[in-house]
Amino acid sequence: MASCLHNLSEYDASLMPCKDKVKNQRYAIAVADWNSNVTYPLLEGAMQALCENGAEHVDVVHVPGAFELTYAARKFQEAHRYDAIIVLGCVIQGDTPHFDYVCGGTTQGIAALNARVGMPPVIFGLLTVN
């Protein structure tokens, strides 16, 4: 859990796979354009972390919002070209139940994709904030 004493954005590079392995792997990132003031910096950070650790093959697709992340991730899985998929989005709570529907649907969708046998993992990067 993140706190003022533990920043989850920091990581120990020695725990990362060797750069030779990462160099030969393919990654895909799906990023939501909604709340781009949050999601685009998330994309920049993900790209920076991947590149710093040797990744050379990263494909990025933009989707309208968080709900479409599941569709993009499934298409990446079905392409059978990627070793890992990352989804990035941000849903900000408002005064309607829309927040709950989008967050719940996206979470369940990504969880279902991760349960598929023989498919690459989908890393869940959806911020759900007040």
Positions of the model-derived regions?
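Short, ordered loop/turn segments at secondary-structure junctions
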Residues: 33-34, 63, 90-91, 126-130
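Glycine-rich phosphate/diphosphate-binding loop of Rossmann-like nucleotide-binding domains
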Residues: 17-62
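Glycine-rich phosphate-binding loop
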Residues: 72-110, 114
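N-terminal amphipathic/basic leader segments beginning at the initiator methionine
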Residues: 1-23
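C-terminal binding/interaction regions
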Residues: 2-5, 25, 106-130
